[in-house]
Amino acid sequence: MGKGSIASHKEEILLAGCAIVIICFWYFLFPHLLLMREASQLFLWNSEYFAERIVVPGGFAQYIGEFLVQFFHHPFNGGLIYAALFVIAQQLTKHIFPRLPLLLTFIPSFVLWAIALYFYIPLTLTVAILMVMLMIALLPKRKTARIAYIIILLPVAYWLAGPADYYWVEEHPSTLEEMKYDLMMRQKDWKGIVERYNKQPSASPAVQHASRLAGFQLGIIPEQSLHRADIFSNQSLRSEASSFIMDEVYFLLGLVNMSQRATFEAMESIPNHNKSGRALKRLVETSLITQQYPLALKYLDILQETAFYRQWAAQTRPLAENPVLIQQHPRYQSLREAYAKTKDAVFY
């Protein structure tokens, strides 16, 4: 490819390069943030869910944002989606400001990329901004038509994209760290947890409990070291990520009631009060173990309206409908036996 050919395709090369960098950035460096975003919502494929969103200003932008976030269940998909949004933002900027130098048309894309790193700012904001940019890009060139377009578009834009509001949410400094440990807990990466903690000890109580559990799983520490009094401290549940960590710790230790409570704490910690597909999945498991079968069926009915939990819900339903099958389940039966022998406890 000659210099002239490269110059003529400079924009395409820049976009392709940025897209690859963004995909790698999210997939290799921040998969924990993508997965926690996915765990912080419950997108349902039914008309009631759509109607619940669309009846409020900005609900359509929220619906589209949550539709996209459900695919973060696989981090590579999240990287692809963010890369696509980056390209769309650059192309819309170029269309709105055709005389702007090429490199400057990337500024809105990089700003949206930076915003995406803040966990408490949902994808709704990015979608709403792109919707408004698209509406501006479609402005007619004739003055009369443009005025009519703006008059009609203003209320439509307000309803679809929603109003803007800004408020300060103090993000706990250990939140991202807890998300990383939460991902390793889900992957059962016990060696990685121990190595990371030994390299850089954490002040997070949840991370400390996770490191002790990992040490036990590797045979480094005895089981007695796990049953400390502070394992029931509510200081371990100060964020959504830490609550999910403790849910895993309690569940693997056979403290099923505590796992259930930590799961509820995680769901209540979601910033916009969404429900969580990941949390409901765990609540199905705890309900099966504690023999609350009608409750398990209720949660399974909800999960069957999702894209990425539907198959698991269909496979698990027979256990709730015919509890005798749980006796043949290698995990649930052993946890049921541990639950029956374990004294219940409460947070303090």
PLM feature spans:
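Internal/C-terminal transmembrane anchor helices
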Residues: 145-166
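Soluble catalytic regions of membrane-associated enzymes that act on cell-envelope
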Residues: 170-336
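Start-transfer (signal-anchor) and selected internal transmembrane alpha helices
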Residues: 1-22, 146-150
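Short hydrophobic/aromatic helix or loop-helix immediately within or flanking a transmembrane segment
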Residues: 54-72, 84-85
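Transmembrane-helix motifs of polytopic, lipid-linked glycan transferases
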Residues: 83-99, 109, 134-136
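Structural signal for the C-terminal ends of transmembrane alpha-helices
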Residues: 26-30, 93-97, 134-145, 161
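Membrane-interface micro-motifs in multi-pass membrane enzymes
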Residues: 36, 40, 54-58, 73, ...
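Helix-to-loop transition at the C-terminal end of transmembrane segments
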Residues: 25-43
